[in-house]
From Swiss-Prot:
Belongs to the aldehyde dehydrogenase family. Coiled coil: none annotated. Signal peptide: none annotated. One of its GO terms (molecular function) is benzaldehyde dehydrogenase (NAD+) activity. This is Benzaldehyde dehydrogenase [NAD(+)] I. It comes from Acinetobacter guillouiae. The keyword DNA damage does not apply. The lineage of its organism: Bacteria, Pseudomonadati, Pseudomonadota, Gammaproteobacteria, Moraxellales.
Length: 23
């Protein structure tokens, strides 16, 4: 049940990391 949440959190972290790196 928490698998989807973990995946979303990972994607969110990756997205933020990429955005920070790009900026």
């Amino acid at each position: 049940p928490n698998i989807q949440t973990k995946i979303i959190e990972q994607i969110w972290k990756e997205h933020i990391f990429q955005g920070t790196v790009v900026k």
